[in-house]
Amino acid sequence: FCDLHASFELRSGVFSNIERILLQTLNSDTIQLYVRKDIELIVKEKYPDLDINPKVYKPGIYLNGSGIWDIDSIKLIQNNLSYSNNNGLIAFQSDNEIQYSELNDYMNQQASVSSIISIDSIKYLWNIFDILSNTIKQDSKLIYNHKKGLLHPSCVLINDDFITISQ
C-alpha cells in the first residue's frame, strides 16, 4: 500500500487523513501537498483540486499527513514553532514562503528543535489498529453535531444519550 500511496490517504476510521483535514478547513484556506516525486503524478490525478508539489509553498501551518488531525489540534500550532510526536516532526508554522527545493532541508531544521505535541500518527500500517476506536469517535463528531439543531418546544426526548440530532 505505502509504495504507491501517500500517508495522508490512509483510512483510520470513517475518513482518510486528507479527508479529515479537508473537512476542517475553510474554503479560503490553501491546501498544498508535498509528496514523493515517485507518486506525484498519481496524487495529482486523484486530487486535481489540490496544489501538489508547487514551486513555492505559502506561509501557514504545515501538517504531517500521517497525523490524525482535528480542529482543536490544529489550533495548537503556534507562530514559528515546530512540533513532534513519538514518530518525529508532525507540524510547524512558518510566516515565510518556502521554495520546493528548500522544503526538505527546512523540515529537517524544524525537526531538530521542536515541542512535544500529543497527536496520534501512523508510522506503520498496523498502527491504525491502536488508534481506530479514537478516530471513529473523532470522526463521528465531524459527521454529526450531537444534539445540535432546533427542536419543536413540544418535543420530549427519552433516552437522549442515544439520540443524534444533526443540522
Language model features by range: what are they?
Residues 1-159:
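Terminal amphipathic alpha-helical/low-complexity segments used for targeting or macromolecular assembly
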Residues 151, 165-166:
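Hydrophobic face of beta-strands forming the core of extended beta-sheets/solenoids
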